[in-house]
Amino acid sequence: MLASGYGRQGNEFEQPISARHKMMETLTVFDDVKVPWERVFLNGEVDMAGPLAKAFVEFHRFTAVSYKLPLVDVFVGASHLMAEYNGILRAGHVRDKLAKLISYAQICRGMTREAAREAKTVDGIAVPNAELINIAKLYFATNYHQALAWVQDIAGGLLVTGPSAEDLEDPKLRGLLDKYLSAAGSSAEDRLRLMNLIAELTATDFAGYQAVLAIHAEGSIEAEKMTIWRQHNVEPSVLYAKRLAGIANN
């Protein structure tokens, strides 16, 4: 098992998330591994392979979007607060980006809720609507990098040029930083703390890890499209189009 940890070793000022919460992925190789029979669930039942994979589609992609909702919420909250600190909240282009971020978050939330509401019960287990949850995951994944761009644009270049914790603690530098980096209604330190939070989510190795997760975790974009294609009942729409066009339904 080869482990890959994401998030630099650092302090909670510069890395407010990864300094406290590590994300770990592994490359796991099973080479001549003995599996106890009580842990063997399929043994030649090839007809069950499809339903097993489908269960991944229905449940795992539901969790995929569900656990991303707090992330898109912090995009909205951090961007709004940073716009206040930067003194640009009244700018039309900033409000435009904030409205798009809000829409992104709420569409992801609404589609996830609807997938739960449209669940079917199988053997006493609620199964999310596969079509709707794949649409939710597809929307989240295909718009994630654009959302990052909106957040970065509102925050500004201090995401990568901001001072370190050591700089802020230096008596000779602290006065200059307080003078030039303080914001409307905010101290320089608080503004930098918020900037570092946004940087951690949009401009670090941890952010890159999250961006790859958005595309590939719990199923790739093409896998989601394939599921939507297979799950959607297009026949009623085809019949409706025929009726409006005056085409006989043979």
Language model segments and positions:
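Active-site-proximal binding-pocket segments
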Residues: C108, G124-N129
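FAD-binding core of flavoproteins
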Residues: M1-Y67, W229-N250
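Generic structural signal for well-ordered, non-membrane alpha-helical segments
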Residues: M23, V65-K68, V72, A105, ...
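Short, charged, amphipathic alpha-helical segments
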Residues: R95-A99, V127-N134
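Intrinsically disordered or highly flexible coil/loop and linker segments, enriched in small
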Residues: R39-V40, I88-A91, I107-E114, E118-T121, ...
